[in-house]
Amino acid sequence: MNDEEQDDKTKELPLGKETEANLFKSRSIFIYGPINQELAQKVCSQLVALAAASDEDIRIYVNSPGGHVESGDSIHDMVKFIKPKVWMIGTGWVASAGALIYVAAPRERRLCLPNTRFLLHQPSGGTRGMASDIEIQAREIIKMNERLNKIMAEATGQPLEKIAKDTDRDYWLSAEEAKDYGLVSRIVTSQADI
């Protein structure tokens, strides 16, 4: 790395720290990209830190293709665990484990931008190994699917049977469709709407 490249890296650091400080001050968290353990650890740490700093509301912006369900579970549970009220703002797409995180907030605090798309579906997993291990993993995926369907039914007000039928395959919803379905309370177009 030459001196010019090193200077560019050094110049980026204060902006990064300043941006993070501003996000902390504004009590905003961004969940962008795949859901994994690293993201879950970061988001849960941010939630605990913000809760320790104040009881003021927190905003989480979600734009995710989904990912690891258990990582999504940890964020979902932490949102419910902390004292401050959490608002979810969907943007881009809110899919799979991203939707699991999104519904951690009560319906009245679930918002989205107009072009947000939502995807609900059953969990998937790759299995290999001995037949008995594959059987165990299949049972666990079925239990996970039943649990996730129950969470979605409670969050949306839809009957469990409808959720199970809809999530049997990929179930896409526009912002307006998600509002009608009970995923979203309001579609917002500016920060002033929040």
From Swiss-Prot:
The protein's superkingdom reads Bacteria
Kindly state which reaction or reactions the protein catalyses. Answer: Hydrolysis of proteins to small peptides in the presence of ATP and magnesium. alpha-casein is the usual test substrate. In the absence of ATP, only oligopeptides shorter than five residues are hydrolyzed (such as succinyl-Leu-Tyr-|-NHMec, and Leu-Tyr-Leu-|-Tyr-Trp, in which cleavage of the -Tyr-|-Leu- and -Tyr-|-Trp bonds also occurs)
Keyword Phosphoprotein assigned? no
Q: What is its EC number?
A: 3.4.21.92
Enumerate the subcellular locations listed in this protein's record, separating them with semicolons. Cytoplasm
Which PROSITE patterns does this chain map to? Answer: CLP_PROTEASE_HIS
Q: Which CDD domains match?
A: S14_ClpP_2
Listed InterPro entries:
ClpP, ClpP/crotonase-like_dom_sf, ClpP/TepA, ClpP_His_AS
Q: Name one GO biological process term.
A: protein quality control for misfolded or incompletely synthesized proteins
A GO CC annotation recorded here is:
cytoplasm
GO molecular function per UniProt: ATP-dependent peptidase activity; ATPase binding; serine-type endopeptidase activity
- Broadest EC class assigned to this enzyme: hydrolase
Function per UniProt: Cleaves peptides in various proteins in a process that requires ATP hydrolysis. Has a chymotrypsin-like activity. Plays a major role in the degradation of misfolded proteins.
> What is the name attached to this protein's record?
ATP-dependent Clp protease proteolytic subunit 3
The coding gene here is clpP3
